[in-house]
Amino acid sequence: EDALNELGKALHKQKLPSEIVEQVYSGKLRQEVITLETVLKDYVSYKSDTPKAEKEITQRVERLRKDMQHIYGKQKLRYVSLNDISRQDANDLRDHLLSRVSANSAVRMLGVVRTAINHAIVEHSLNIPNVFTNLRIKGAGASKLDRLPLSDTQVVHLEAAYSNDITAWALFVCLRDTGCRVSEIAGLRVKDCDTDKECLIISPTPWRTLKTNNSHRSVPLSPEAIKALEEVSQGKDPEAPLFPQYAKERGGDNCSAMLMKRLRTIITDKKLTMHSLRHRMKDKLRNTGCPEAISMAILGHGSNTVAANYGSGYALDVMREHMEKVWA
């Protein structure tokens, strides 16, 4: 009994949660305490039905766990019962997330917490409310404002952030002049850059899939993009990845992070990202009179009606005609 008292006093000095200290004083262990930490671990286990899914959900939850630890502290995250997590705790996490990510990103991240807690409530037959339900998030759902197009002036200013590295420059110019997704460019093979036809061939590779079937397409290249791609592909095998450092699982994410790090040295507005170059291409095509069907073919959206109507060879010329107005 004396030993338990001494241990209890020692733990109390370490500022452990009172319920843990009380268990030590009593000499009796209570039923397993369900905490935010165990909720997250159980959720990862529940969602990890394949190795790929396990890796993705683990990375997502780990980032979220770090945010929660920053707000709640390690002790609260690991030892405080889920029953003692309050609505104010949920609001505190929401406010922290909104200080560093967009409203819609915060919604997605808080959705993981809410779903994980719902899973724990069902699996452990807990009779408690989910305090992360129906959190008010100002600005959520305003998807049209989440990612704004970059202006021509901003694009010119951005050139300085990429021009000192041939890889970064080739990626930037291709994204700027094609409107392709970052993953589509990052996952190219050398042979996908057809300098004779002056186009990119966007197709699946061993290290990168495509978002949709309609993403499989050919896209005209600007003279500046051709020059940048020739420089970066020099001496490489046609079957080899054009950007070997990104020819791996989640390579597109790594590429995007590198490009975003450079972009943020010039532009700090969170609504402007590398994807804003894609929005810019879409807007400029529309503003120069490009028909919607041709714009969709260039960007890999919808059904590729251009190829069906004109034939694939002529479709490339049709797309180039409209893209040249954007490049001018």
Tell me what each language-model feature is.
Residues 149, 206-208, 299-328:
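Catalytic-site neighborhood detector that most strongly recognizes the C-terminal catalytic loop/helix
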Residues 2-13, 63-70, 80-91, 99-134, ...:
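N-terminal DNA-binding recognition helix of tyrosine site-specific recombinases/integrases
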Residues 103, 107-111, 126, 131-182, ...:
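Basic, Lys/Arg- and aromatic-enriched nucleic-acid-binding interface segment
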